[in-house]
Amino acid sequence: MADLAKIVEDLSSLTVLEAAELSKLLEEKWGVSAAAPVAVAAAGGAAGAAAPVEEEKTEFDVILTDAGANKINVIKEVRAITGLGLKEAKDLVEGAPKAVKEAVSKAEAADLKKKLEDAGAKVDVK
């Protein structure tokens, strides 16, 4: 049972982006599709992350709400910010609204928001 508790603890500490990547890897490994459960898990993870941010006000999440007309520029900027590969960045942009970066300082969140908006995206900071 201790091993299962460790797995649950490790999974609980994943960011939304890490959880999405884990989901894709498991889908490939097991040959299944988990489209609906992934959306529910991502929404639950985002809601869980939002509560501590409101209490502390020292960490913010940068949420991409819409890619806008210049999707290619937004994908390039997301890649630069997150270090994701082309496919992962494209999936994140096309799956908006999604968290681009979580638990960042207010200054970094403002900087990331400006970069993404300059690329043509609509961004929220929560």
From Swiss-Prot:
According to the record's subunit comment, the protein's assembly and interactions are: Homodimer. Part of the ribosomal stalk of the 50S ribosomal subunit. Forms a multimeric L10(L12)X complex, where L10 forms an elongated spine to which 2 to 4 L12 dimers bind in a sequential fashion. Binds GTP-bound translation factors.
> Which cellular component terms (GO) are annotated to the entry?
cytosolic large ribosomal subunit
Iron-sulfur among keywords: no
Which keywords belong to this entry?
Answer: Ribonucleoprotein, Ribosomal protein
Family named by the database record: Belongs to the bacterial ribosomal protein bL12 family.
CDD domains membership: Ribosomal_L7_L12
Family annotation (InterPro entries) = Ribosomal_bL12 (IPR000206), Ribosomal_bL12_C (IPR013823), Ribosomal_bL12_C/ClpS-like (IPR014719), Ribosomal_bL12_oligo (IPR008932), Ribosomal_bL12_oligo_N_sf (IPR036235)
Functional description taken from the UniProt entry: Forms part of the ribosomal stalk which helps the ribosome interact with GTP-bound translation factors. Is thus essential for accurate translation.
What organism, scientifically named, is this protein from?
Rhizobium meliloti (strain 1021)
Q: Where are the transmembrane segments?
A: none
Task: Enumerate the GO terms in the molecular function aspect.
Answer: mRNA binding; structural constituent of ribosome
Q: Which PANTHER family match?
A: 39S RIBOSOMAL PROTEIN L12 (PTHR45987), LARGE RIBOSOMAL SUBUNIT PROTEIN BL12M (PTHR45987:SF4)
> What is the name of this protein?
Large ribosomal subunit protein bL12
Q: Could you tell me which Pfam families the record lists for this protein?
A: Ribosomal_L12, Ribosomal_L12_N
